[in-house]
Amino acid sequence: DPGSSFNPLMTIAENVAEPLLVHHKYGSVADAKNYVGDLLEMVQLPRAYMNRFPHELSGGQRQRASLARGLALKPSLLIADEPTSALDVSVQAKVLELFKRLQAEIGFACLFITHDLAVVDMLADRIMVMHKGQIVEHGDADQIMQHPENPYTKKLLASLPVPDPREQQQHRAHLHELLAQEA
């Protein structure tokens, strides 16, 4: 939940400005106000939201405000741990599109931690698959998604739902074959 990382007693402006103040980039929230407003607009939130409190924002809005705070110090690497898991699918898609656009515009690298393979397929250039705390496969995203080598990765990808019923039936048969090989 992106809201859990915000201080509920502070406005969105104060929350977004906090890393800027801690790292002495600005002397006060008032000094950082224009930059915070720019950050909010960058993540598609109106400047007026600076005066709101976290509980006044929807989940998607809190996620975008959290992204603004994460980008405040202009990082070269952003670590995003399950950033869309608490959001409904339509909001997820908007946040992911925003994320892709900002990554292209600003040029930061991202370590995106997720269990959602549709998100991985949409965002990743490179993939690392973990099973029981161990890395079992890593490489180019297209290679891993289209031609996985590790048995766990194969089962993981075979378990994904497919919109086409005929293709889904083939997908399930392949998953059952993989599971039978394991037995």
Q: PLM ranges: what are they?
A:
Residues 16, 67, 95:
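Hydrophobic anchor residue at the start of the ABC signature
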Residues 120-122:
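A short, surface-exposed alpha-helical micro-motif characterized by mixed small hydrophobic
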Residues 53-57, 61:
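Conserved ABC ATPase signature
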Residues 30-48, 157-158:
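Conserved ABC ATPase "signature" region
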Residues 138-139, 147:
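ABC ATPase "signature
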Residues 72-76:
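A short, proline-enriched helix->beta-strand linker immediately N-terminal to the Walker B motif
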